[in-house]
Structure formats: C-alpha cells, structure tokens
Amino acid sequence: MYKRQEYPDCEVVVIPGITAASSGAAVLGAPLNHDFCVISLSDLLTPWERIEKRLIAAVEGDFAMAIYNPSSHKRADYLQRACDILLSHGAKEDRACGYVENIGREGTKAVTCTLGELRDAKVNMFTTVFIGNSQSEIVGDKLVTKRGYIV
C-alpha cells in the first residue's frame, strides 16, 4: 500500500485492467507481437522533444508501436508530425499500420492502412494508433506482426 504524505489517510488501490493497447490490438489483429512500445503524443506532461526522441528510438529499434493521444483540438497535427519523424528515420511509406476508434464502446471502428496513409488520417482522442515494425503485414483486414512461428 502506498500513502502520499500530502494525504496520509488516502489509500491508493490499483485494479488490474486491460489497456487500450491490448484491447485495440485484439480488435485490429495481432500488431503487438514480438517487441513493442507504447508512446503518448500528449505533450501536456512530456516535452515534445522527449516524445520525438522516443519515436526515433522506437523506429530505429524496429519496434511495433501503440500510440496514445494521437490528436486533439490543440494538437491536430501531432500524428502527422509523428509519422514524418518515423519516415525521416527509416520507416517506409508502405509500413503496415492501423488504428481503432472507440475501443470497447459502441461504434468501434478499426482501420488498416500504410504509414503514408496514416499520416493523413483523421483521428481523435478516442483513437489508439498502431504502427507495425518492418516485418508487420496487413492480412485481409487485420494488422499482423509475425513472430516467426510456422503454423
């Protein structure tokens, strides 16, 4: 149990749940197999320069990515900026990607696309974006990052 000094009588309880990355990945297919990372594009608490470094490290490490907070009214171009960073650091325009809007809610919408198409996608704060690694593929309407198993 953790107690903060400012509120010594307040107990913090952690309840395990399923992240938007995991639940969105299940809707989209299997984009987060092998190694992956989760990056938020919100610069409210993290400077954009640090977010940019994380994006560069992820693409240079060939990680599949789940992207939270891809766009808002004040940050309408952040997903486009993120895609431009990935493209300028080695990702190809045809890299397999996708996104899921309203995960677990009425009106869930899943879309597969390329990184080039994702750059111009209209997304919102209810959207989780998935960017495959260099081995990811779009199979039918699913985004799949293979692990190398032969089935």
Residue ranges and their predicted role:
Residues 3-61:
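Class I SAM-dependent methyltransferase SAM-binding "motif I" and its flanking Rossmann-like core
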Residues 60-151:
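A contiguous loop/helix-start segment that scaffolds small-molecule binding in enzyme catalytic cores
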Residues 1-2, 129:
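Generic detector of short, aliphatic-rich beta-strand segments that form the cores of beta-sheets
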